Amino acid sequence: MITLLRHWLDYGQRASKLKKEKLHSELEQLKNQVSPQFLLNMLSKATELAVVDPRQTSAILVQLGKLLRYQLYDSSREKVFFSADLSFLENFLNLEKMLNPMLCFTITKEGPVNYLLVPPLLFIPFVEYFIYQSERIEKEYYIHLAFRVEKGELLFSCASSVRHRDISKLDNIRRRLELLYETYSLEEVQGDTENRINMHLTLSR
């Protein structure tokens, strides 16, 4: 009986370990990385400007280096400071603006957000959701990011004048949130002139 109990406990521990490893592997696959196409576009832009505008070429390469450094080193951690993930977002948007001057963006914060610990690269999928659809647009467009901490919740919204109808792109984001947070909400609000994605996360105490 004791031997049987030991086997049962060992089996339970192995099953639990395998489940955790599977979830970790799935989380790593869902973690968004800077797309290779974006990197190729930036390198192509830097090459074109190397002769006519060396200063901007240098600026592009510096910003690109910051993105890659964060992606290679900091994003491997389980949690990072919100301020670090926000800097990554700002660098990404600044680079995108160098590539496409039609982009206008703003980022606002309310409440004690800077010292929150969040999973790395949590917010970049929302930006990319609109950025890559904007390639077909030949006029100015905007992306507004807003963060607010209130009553134990992180409230985030990403609004854009880009009309995006492929809501299936949110599936990977939703699955990652399911694995990371016990309580969350995610919705897309589509208007005549603006699309907005709202996300609410219950912060661990």
Give residue spans per PLM region.
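Two-component histidine phosphotransfer core
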Residues: 1-188, 196
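Short C-terminal beta-strand
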Residues: 195-205
